[in-house]
C-alpha cells in the first residue's frame, strides 16, 4: 500500500481499520457528530489545514451539529493510500476535539 497512485482493493480498505468510515461508491465517507456549530467549524478548519499540507482535498459539509467528509482520489477514480492517510488524520483531529464518527 505504498504507491500513492494505486487504487486500493476492498480487502486493503477493510485492513486499514478506519472506525466510522464507510465505503460509498468509489469514496470513503464519514459523519462526525460535533453537537455544536463552533466545534464543527474548528474541525473543518483543522481538516482544511491538513488537506492543504497533504495537497489532497476532501469534500466537506458543515451543518449545525455535524461535519460530513468524503474522500476519493479523482485521478484514479477510487480510493488510494492518500485517502486512508487523510482519513486517519481527520479522525485524529476529531478525537482531539472529543468528537466521534457515526458508526
Q: Which positions does each model-derived feature cover?
A:
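Charge-rich alpha-helical segments
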Residues: 1-103
